[in-house]
């Protein structure tokens, strides 16, 4: 039974990831006044499967100067972590109901840095190494604000459990009282997933493709799959934390429908930002975090800690 549950979680994620790639290419096409993929299958719907077939049947070339063990391990680790992050998410019931679900997500997403670092270093290429170092600095930096924003929201729910967060928002979405935090969270998730305007790691004009430049065929596809799964996961987490839907025990399907709709709308916002915004300069990226986001999130954390004390109560406890 646990194996069936695992497959029922993984297969829809893989399908969603495949069609997210197609949707992105279609949106990019229409925004640039062209069609996008429209040859394979009706309206190009089978394009992701054709791409997968092509990539996984090609020979995975390895640079002769690369460190083979890490070079092969890195993409596998990236995909494993991307799938592992989904286990505590309530949709409406999580695969594993962890008491410290949010802490687990934060800790596991930090491990994704290693796959990027290994791939950049093991490729033995200057472009890959510079891309990897940028990605690591960016990811570690933005995780600081993500953690502080999470702490602020947890002070309102009183638990690290994601299901409790959903219960907290039965009467009011957390995005309304904490909209500055929600805005900073959304921008930080863009940086965390290395998306435009923070895709410095894959700056085509500077680094060709970034940390995955030496990868081809299957391993290259694994990196792409991990990236798009992380995008969907981050938006799903955003929907859970700030746009929690009321869970009705009589109709769990309704919860799932609302929940997925919110996650899809947030994901489409990611794609729209990709088409509309130019890339940040690296110093601007770090300036935004350390000089703007960090002081603001720390100030808001102090506010959410002091408020219950000021009104002679304690934070909610569950």
From Swiss-Prot:
Keyword Membrane belongs to the record: yes
UniProt-listed GO biological process terms: aerobic respiration; mitochondrial electron transport, NADH to ubiquinone; mitochondrial respiratory chain complex I assembly
PROSITE patterns listed in its UniProt record: COMPLEX1_ND1_1, COMPLEX1_ND1_2
Listed EC numbers: 7.1.1.2
GO molecular function terms attached to this record: NADH dehydrogenase (ubiquinone) activity
Enzyme category, top tier: translocase
CC per GO annotation: mitochondrial inner membrane; respiratory chain complex I
Entry keyword annotation includes Translocase: yes
Key words, A-Z: Electron transport, Membrane, Mitochondrion, Mitochondrion inner membrane, NAD, Respiratory chain, Translocase, Transmembrane, Transmembrane helix, Transport, Ubiquinone
Principal location: mitochondrion
Segments passing through the bilayer: 2-22, 68-88, 100-120, 146-166, 171-191, 213-233, 253-273, 285-305
Membrane topology (UniProt): Multi-pass membrane protein
Pfam family, one: NADHdh
Subcellular location: Mitochondrion inner membrane
Reaction(s) this enzyme catalyzes, per UniProt: a ubiquinone + NADH + 5 H(+)(in) = a ubiquinol + NAD(+) + 4 H(+)(out)
Function: Core subunit of the mitochondrial membrane respiratory chain NADH dehydrogenase (Complex I) which catalyzes electron transfer from NADH through the respiratory chain, using ubiquinone as an electron acceptor. Essential for the catalytic activity and assembly of complex I.
Quaternary data: Core subunit of respiratory chain NADH dehydrogenase (Complex I) which is composed of 45 different subunits.
PANTHER family: NADH DEHYDROGENASE SUBUNIT 1, NADH-UBIQUINONE OXIDOREDUCTASE CHAIN 1
HAMAP family hit by this protein: NDH1_NuoH
Similarity field: Belongs to the complex I subunit 1 family.
Listed name of the protein: NADH-ubiquinone oxidoreductase chain 1
Organism: Pan troglodytes
């Amino acid at each position: 039974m646990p194996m069936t549950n695992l497959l029922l979680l993984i297969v829809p994620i893989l399908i969603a990831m495949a069609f997210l790639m197609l949707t992105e290419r279609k949106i990019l096409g229409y925004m640039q006044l062209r069609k996008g993929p429209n040859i394979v299958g009706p309206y190009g719907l089978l394009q992701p499967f054709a791409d997968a077939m092509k990539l996984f049947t090609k020979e995975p070339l390895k640079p002769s100067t690369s460190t083979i063990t890490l070079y092969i391990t890195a993409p596998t680790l990236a995909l494993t972590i991307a799938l592992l992050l989904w286990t505590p998410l309530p949709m409406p019931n999580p695969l594993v109901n962890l008491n410290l679900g949010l802490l687990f997500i934060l800790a596991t997403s930090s491990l994704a840095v290693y796959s990027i670092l290994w791939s950049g270093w093991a490729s033995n290429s200057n472009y890959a190494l510079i891309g990897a170092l940028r990605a690591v600095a960016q990811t570690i930096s933005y995780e600081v604000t993500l953690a502080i924003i999470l702490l602020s929201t947890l002070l309102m729910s009183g638990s690290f459990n994601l299901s409790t967060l959903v219960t907290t928002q039965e009467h009011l979405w957390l995005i309304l009282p904490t909209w500055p935090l929600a805005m900073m969270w959304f921008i930080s998730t863009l940086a965390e997933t290395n998306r435009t305007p923070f895709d410095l790691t894959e700056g085509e004009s500077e680094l060709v493709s970034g940390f995955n430049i030496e990868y081809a065929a299957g391993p290259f596809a694994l990196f792409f799959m991990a990236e798009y799964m992380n995008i969907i996961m981050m938006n799903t987490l955003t929907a859970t934390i700030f746009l929690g839907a009321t869970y009705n025990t009589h109709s769990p399907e309704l919860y799932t429908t609302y929940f997925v709709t919110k996650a899809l709308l947030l994901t489409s916002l990611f794609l729209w930002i990709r088409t509309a915004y130019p890339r940040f300069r690296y110093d601007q990226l770090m300036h935004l975090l350390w000089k703007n986001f960090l002081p603001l999130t720390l100030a808001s954390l102090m506010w959410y800690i002091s408020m219950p004390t000021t009104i002679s109560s304690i934070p909610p406890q569950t």
